[in-house]
């Protein structure tokens, strides 16, 4: 059974500068299986469908965010960082061996949208207790040096389907739910 956090959508102190609009370029490394190009396009489409001031486009080189193969020894599905200097974090490491290639436009797209979310400043909705989505012992990521700011207008009630929960079950699809849409709209 999955439990969820008691407060939901969070962002970092630093965000991507968008002004009146900004398009972020994303590249999928050729070291990743072809299914990841499909998944990248699906993740980008999820964001662009929200009509935000931040938009995304897939490119083959010169990207602001590169989706790259994680080391074979990686013990995570994927890992991104947080924005600095008004720019997105520049890399997401993806453990394609652990994720596989099935369900690129749902499961894999959810993972990529989640990591892109980190790159533009979204925290785990259950950062205060990862056991809500991951199980196991209580694990608080804390505000760290990047901040954990509750996004206005998002609920303090449980929301088990956010795209920014820390963990995801194999094969699950988490498109943006209504609370995610509010968070995206408030921030971007």
Please place each PLM-identified region on the residue numbering.
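The catalytic-center signature of Zn2+-dependent metalloproteases
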Residues: 106, 113-174
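Acidic helix-start/capping segments at beta-turn-to-alpha-helix junctions
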Residues: 25-30, 57-75, 134-136
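Sec-exported extracytoplasmic/periplasmic mature domains
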Residues: 45-53, 117-125, 169, 185-188
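Surface-exposed patches in mature extracellular/periplasmic domains of secreted proteins
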Residues: 49-63, 124-131
